[in-house]
């Protein structure tokens, strides 16, 4: 389960599918990490073991705890390079002892050559190559051990696009192909109590779904410091 009734329904299989790669992408502070932490909390509730690969070095244990994550039972890794992050992910998946791995985020998976290089050096296509190599290797292991791997991704603007959407996700095209489910998450409005903003209205679209019909959507509220609002969802549904 994702911790959101609406998203579980939109996914068509009652939650995120195991043994698959899932991509959750959206603009900054749209609720990507919140949705993943909610899913981790649900997985742990059912006795699952979860890992969080924090390439952004932005994991907040206090917030995670508020969302119901058992932080002391969570495998947390803060790798230095993209290679290291994906190697850790592969090792965790191959072990067969982990139910769910979250990688936060693809944009922060910086290749070693880029970290060690000079500021002005050109490293075109390095990250895309890294992702496609890693996913080729990972997919088989994921299927075999029935692990769920979630990649969080950011949105970038393509320059000079005349028609079609100018938005693209980072890390090349490999993830688009290898992901069985792709979720597009957006903040659509604010929730106010008097004059104070207490949360965000959020919309999730299932852009790609290989395990159920795609293009369904869900709307829910994320309250600051609390996570997804169950009551709000029940009323809406």
UniProtKB/Swiss-Prot annotation:
Signal peptide: none
Alphabetized Gene3D superfamilies for the sequence: P-loop containing nucleotide triphosphate hydrolases
Stored SMART domains: AAA (SM00382)
Subcellular location field: Cytoplasm
GO biological process: DNA recombination; DNA repair; SOS response
One cellular component term from this protein's GO annotations in UniProt: cytosol
Pfam families in the cross-refs: RecA
Ligand binding (ATP): 26-33
UniProt-listed InterPro entries: AAA+_ATPase (IPR003593), DNA_recomb/repair_RecA (IPR013765), DNA_recomb/repair_RecA_CS (IPR020584), P-loop_NTPase (IPR027417), RecA-like_N (IPR049428), RecA_ATP-bd (IPR020588), RecA_monomer-monomer_interface (IPR020587)
Primary subcellular site in the record, as a coarse category: cytoplasm
PROSITE patterns for the chain: RECA_1, RECA_2, RECA_3
Swiss-Prot/TrEMBL keywords: ATP-binding, Cytoplasm, DNA damage, DNA recombination, DNA repair, DNA-binding, Nucleotide-binding, SOS response
Any one GO MF annotation of this record: ATP binding
Coiled-coil ranges (or none): none
UniProt function note: Can catalyze the hydrolysis of ATP in the presence of single-stranded DNA, the ATP-dependent uptake of single-stranded DNA by duplex DNA, and the ATP-dependent hybridization of homologous single-stranded DNAs. It interacts with LexA causing its activation and leading to its autocatalytic cleavage.
Family from the record: Belongs to the RecA family.
PANTHER family documented for this protein: MITOCHONDRIAL DNA REPAIR PROTEIN RECA HOMOLOG-RELATED (PTHR45900:SF1), RECA (PTHR45900)
Protein name stated in the entry: Protein RecA
